[in-house]
Amino acid sequence: MISCEISIQDQEKNSISQHLKRSFQILCVILHLLVDSLATESDFNYYIDHLQQPSYNAYDLIYLCFHGQKKCICFADKTDLALMAFAEKEENFGIFEGRNVHFGSCSTLKMREEDIKMFKQLTKARMITGYTKDVDLTSSFIFETWLMDAINRNEGYAAKRMDDL
């Protein structure tokens, strides 16, 4: 980012905004390529199991970025995992205890509010965030950058629905 700031330092404000927007679009394309080749359910379980290791105790934010659809995250091998099926597995009880979990995937939280609360209760997550509709990659990247920063900067924050803000 430093080289970006130097290269646009003397340009007009509008030009800077366009340049930054283009930089976000390029970065989002790179992220999109990574997401497309990301994981299978087996890979997902491998990394989720690591959360039980003491060396991960300090991590209080779990950011899960996949393709998504109603109530599910989708893997590169064209399979999907229903959130409630994940939460209801005995080995996942309390898996996110005290942590904030963000699903950076389209429509994953398009489910009944009671089910989201049950997911939170079963996994013991502190907070669950994500999308109830399909979102474009650039907008979601910008929003998630803000969200991660807000969570990181504010220990005493409280969650609200975007519609309530």
What are these regions (language model features)?
Residues 44, 69, 131:
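Gly/Ser/Thr-rich helix-start
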Residues 1-61, 80-82, 96-98, 102-104, ...:
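A domain-level signal for caspase-like cysteine endopeptidase catalytic cores
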Residues 51, 151-152:
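Hydrophobic residues in alpha-helical segments
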Residues 78-141:
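Catalytic cores of nucleophile-dependent amide-cleaving enzymes
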Residues 60-74, 127:
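Active-site microenvironments of hydrolase-like enzyme catalytic domains
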Residues 153-165:
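A conserved mid-domain beta-alpha-beta active-site/ligand-binding segment of alpha/beta enzyme cores
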Residues 9-14, 68-72, 107-111, 134-136:
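Short acidic, S/G/P-rich loop/turn micro-motifs used as interaction or catalytic elements
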Residues 49, 141-148:
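Short, surface-exposed amphipathic charged segments that create phosphate/polyanion-binding patches used
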